[in-house]
Amino acid sequence: GVDADLIDPDGYYYPVTTTPLVLMGNADYDNMPSDWTDLTKDEYKGLYQLHNLGGGTAKTVFASIISRYQDPDGDLGISDEGWEIAAKFLGNAHNIADGEDAVGSVIDGTYPMDEHWASGVLTEQKDRDYKFQIMTPDIGEPYVVESLAISAGTKKYDTCVAFLNWLGSSDVQLDWSNNYGTIPCQKEALDQVSDDIKELMETLKPQDLDWSFIAENVDAWVEKAELEYVQ
């Protein structure tokens, strides 16, 4: 079975894997924030790295922050406070440039924090023989769910269903996880994943996000942010 919280409420998409988006930190860094919004404080200026807002990780993290400040009368549906948070969050960050070793910068302390996708954190820990700190906000982390859907009107509906049932089976999902470090949505597979995935997932929980509101506005939010706030 699959966690009901991960299923598309309209029933169009079949969830396969999930990717929590996290802030990882240098193992010895002693001032880890408790939430993304803490990074707006002056004490964190120049100490964390953000990816380009055009990418999925950065865009989703950004949306998960400012969507907390919904205001129907605000600019693009966001309150003045929300845009102040956005300006400080983006302005305090080091923007990762092409070719930079962002993970290496976390390890050597140049920039002791970095936004990252959870499976990537696990891969980097294994490849670099290093254990990162992970921020765990009370509000939870934004989860991205990789899903598949069947095209309307297909003449091979039964074949598609069989493929989805095969791909989503516990055996296939566990094998995929063991080979590529993915985090399965399938509960039986998740119960059998490697210890490092289990350990990480036990500390994380999905943030409750208004995905419809985000989908309607995120491109406009990113455009405004890139024009006005990204340093």
What residues fall within each predicted segment?
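Periplasmic-binding protein-like
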Residues: T19, E84-F89, I96, R128-A152
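Extracytoplasmic ligand-binding site segments that recognize negatively charged/polar headgroups
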Residues: G1-T110
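A residue-level marker of the well-folded mature domains of exported/periplasmic proteins
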Residues: K45, R68, H94, E124-I134, ...
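Short, hydrophobic alpha-helical packing/hinge segments within bilobed ligand-binding/sensory domains
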Residues: A102-S105, V121, C160
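Mature extracytoplasmic/periplasmic domains
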Residues: E141-P142, E146, S151-L209
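Ligand-binding "clamshell"
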Residues: G1-D10, E124-T136
